[in-house]
Regions:
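Terminal, low-structured helical/coil segments at or just beyond the last alpha-helical repeat
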Residues: 193, 198-256
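Structural signature of tandem alpha-helical TPR/SEL1-like repeats
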Residues: 51-63, 86-104, 125-138, 143, ...
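Bacterial Sec signal peptide processing site at the extreme N-terminus
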Residues: 28-51
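Helix-start (N-cap) detector for alpha-helical repeat units in TPR-like alpha-solenoids
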Residues: 38-39, 72-73, 113-114, 147-148, ...
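Sec-dependent bacterial lipoprotein signal peptides
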Residues: 1-34
Length: 256
């Protein structure tokens, strides 16, 4: 049974000390119950969304924000579902609703990565790419030690066909936070697309060293390793290998 608003904590009123302690304990229990219910509803809604049952998913996500009005994921999920339906139906009202919900999500959680991404995509979808780039740049400026804004900004540039600019932002991202597995993964993916397979594999390995719960990245590393070995064997067979330079030499020029 869904948890209703009546079970969610409200602002406590003044009580005697003993009553206050009891009320605080009850409020903590109720808050935990609301958060658990919201999490369950988000999970159910996400499953319905993946199955293409968008109307049913919307109902679940609406229950999330009714149960827990501070739940940023609930607003994001509502926004993403309205966004999908708005694009499918070419309905500007649904897209406007999605934009409002994305902004509500960010009001509750200013560094919500998926919400920034979703809002940026919506702005591009509705003919406002400059606003999308401004959104990400402002987010990055407000969080100078946070790599995710740069990762998402790079993603926008890559989608706009500016891979060189995207690469710069991703290199900045791993400098900003060398412990961000998403940044290393994105940099590896871009380098793989550009044909720099050895460097891409190193970037993937760095991402895995930070977060080893990425089976798809492990598969990419294994595939690239095989491809690099095959390329080397082909080069040897074609007589294209080069003699390594001696120490203190660079391209045949002696250093001092």
């Amino acid at each position: 049974m869904a948890v209703t608003n009546a079970l969610c904590p409200a602002k406590p009123t003044k009580h005697t000390p003993n009553q206050g302690a009891i009320i605080v304990a009850l409020l903590l229990l109720l808050a935990g119950g609301c958060q658990w219910a919201a999490s369950s509803q988000n999970t159910t809604g996400a499953q319905l969304y993946e199955q293409g049952q968008y109307s049913a998913a919307l109902q679940q996500f609406q229950q999330v924000v009714a149960t827990d009005p501070e739940n940023a994921d609930g607003y994001y999920n509502l926004a993403a579902t309205n966004h999908r339906l708005g694009n499918q139906r070419r309905d500007p009202n649904l897209l406007a609703q999605a934009e409002s919900l994305y902004n509500q999500c960010l009001d509750h959680q200013p560094n919500h990565v998926e919400c920034h991404r979703g809002l940026a995509v919506l702005l591009v979808d509705t003919g406002r790419p400059d606003r999308a780039f401004d959104l990400m740049k402002n987010w990055a400026a407000q969080n100078p030690n946070y790599a995710d804004p740069l990762v998402e900004l790079a993603r926008l540039y890559e989608e706009a066909g500016k891979s060189d600019v995207a690469k710069k932002y991703l290199e900045d991202a791993v400098q900003r936070d060398a412990g961000n597995s998403r940044a290393w993964l994105a940099l590896g993916n871009l380098r793989e697309q550009n044909g720099d397979l050895e460097q891409a594999m190193r970037n993937y390995q760095q991402s895995l060293a930070i977060n080893n719960m990425q089976p798809e990245v492990s598969e990419r590393v294994a595939m690239l390793s095989r491809q690099i070995s095959a390329n080397y064997e082909s080069a040897v067979a074609a007589g294209q290998t080069q003699i390594a330079t001696q120490p203190n030499f660079q391209s045949g020029t002696m250093t001092r």
